[in-house]
């Protein structure tokens, strides 16, 4: 019995070490960071029309009414903490719509933000050079890739889930998963 208990404990510790989850960064903590580093907020788009029975706001490749409402609500929370930022999006209807509903600002569309391999990091650095705070709307597989590649985190983002990164001395640092309501 003692052997099996020890084996179970070792197995549990091994699995918890292997399956790392992202650190949590509270949105409320962002304004407290009075440094000169650029911040990058990377969000997944809102609820997709083509994978939902909810009412669409436009074509099937866009977001639903629920997705638009979530983007507006999250944008209001975000704007209360971080009001000065530039908005970027991949070139899909759903990311562009989410970015517009979230921010109410003009959205810069960069197709290269859809390329979710090692080149994404140079793209992120280039975008961050231009702004103190950058908000990017992309896709779940891009966010999962970034989390896995940078920190070996297992992260399957839901709609409008996001990561926070800092660009410090030319390097990208993945701070964690952004907790909007905290």
Each predicted region: which residue ranges?
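Generic beta-sheet signal
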Residues: 38-40, 130-138
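Short, surface-exposed amphipathic charged segments that create phosphate/polyanion-binding patches used
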Residues: 121-127
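Active-site-proximal alpha-helix that buttresses catalytic centers in soluble enzyme cores
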Residues: 5, 10-112, 116-119, 143-144, ...
């Amino acid at each position: 019995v003692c052997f099996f208990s020890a084996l179970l404990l070792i197995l549990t510790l091994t699995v918890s070490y292997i399956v790392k989850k992202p650190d949590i960064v509270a949105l409320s903590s962002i304004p407290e960071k009075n440094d000169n580093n650029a911040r990058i907020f990377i969000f997944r788009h809102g609820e997709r029309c083509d994978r939902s029975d909810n009412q669409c706001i436009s074509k099937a490749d866009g977001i639903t009414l629920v997705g638009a409402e979530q983007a507006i609500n999250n944008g209001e929370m975000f704007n209360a903490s971080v009001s000065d930022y530039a908005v970027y999006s991949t070139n899909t209807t759903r990311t562009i719509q989410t970015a517009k509903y979230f921010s109410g600002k003009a959205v810069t569309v960069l197709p290269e933000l859809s390329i979710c391999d090692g080149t994404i990091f140079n793209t992120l650095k280039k975008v961050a050079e231009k702004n103190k705070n950058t908000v990017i709307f992309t896709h779940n597989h891009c966010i999962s890739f970034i989390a896995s590649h940078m920190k070996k985190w297992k992260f399957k983002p839901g709609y409008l889930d996001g990561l926070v990164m800092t660009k410090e001395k030319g390097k990208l640092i993945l701070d964690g998963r952004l907790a909007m309501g905290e």
